[in-house]
Design a protein with these regions (language model features):
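Intrinsically disordered, low-complexity terminal regions
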Residues: 1-200
Length: 200
């Protein structure tokens, strides 16, 4: 079934088994499916609940909240915060201006660019944070590598440890950050895996 709507329309949909997709620019969107994929180009504030299925949104003008039992989640540039709960599958976020929170049981987590704080935890998988410039970062995994990119001009306070793995701090040592410097506080822990902190 195909429905034509004016640009910026608010959309909600629920199906038991089937895919939901939207092209062009939509307004606020709320979708729910028991089994099926959700694919959007551009939406306003977004909420998606699916028991099994992939979720893709190329861009979100507002906050994004995604829940999936099993599936891959990919969110493009988001003008707001992002919250993802993904029990089984990888999660990829291009960029977010607000806070990012991701919880996963089995899957890798990747955030290319974070404009605020990040909390990402997975039981089995690696976590990569491409760039963070401010706020608080908390990363944790039982089995997997952690990688954190600190933006140029940002001072970092680090509290990181790996029970079985190498910790590499590639940042230059400094004494105290200037009052005008951006600061990020990083807490990262992995039981089995390496940790790398670098400039982005």
């Amino acid at each position: 079934m195909s429905i034509n709507l004016p640009s910026g329309s608010q959309v909600s949909g629920e199906v038991q088994v089937g895919d939901l997709s939207g092209t062009g620019r939509l307004g606020e969107c709320r979708f729910k499916t028991s089994a099926g994929n959700v694919r959007l180009e551009r939406s306003g504030p977004l909420r998606v609940d699916t028991a099994a299925g992939h979720v893709t949104a190329d861009g979100v003008a507002g906050n994004a909240e995604i829940h999936t039992g099993s599936g891959r989640v990919r969110i493009g540039a988001t003008e707001g915060s992002v919250a993802v709960k993904n029990s089984n599958g990888d999660t990829m976020i291009d960029a977010a201006t607000g806070n990012v929170r991701v919880r996963s049981t089995n899957g890798d987590i990747s955030v290319d660019r974070a404009g605020a704080g990040v909390e990402a935890k997975t039981s089995n998988g690696s976590i990569r944070l491409g760039e963070v410039a401010r706020g608080s970062v908390e990363l944790g995994t039982a089995m997997g590598d952690l990688e954190i990119g600190i933006a140029e001009g940002t001072a970092a306070r680090l509290q990181v440890n790996s029970k079985f793995g190498q910790v590499r701090n590639l940042l230059d040592d400094t004494t105290r950050p200037e009052a005008s410097d951006e600061t990020v506080e990083v807490r990262a822990h992995t039981s089995f895996g390496g940790i790398t902190i670098r400039r982005s």
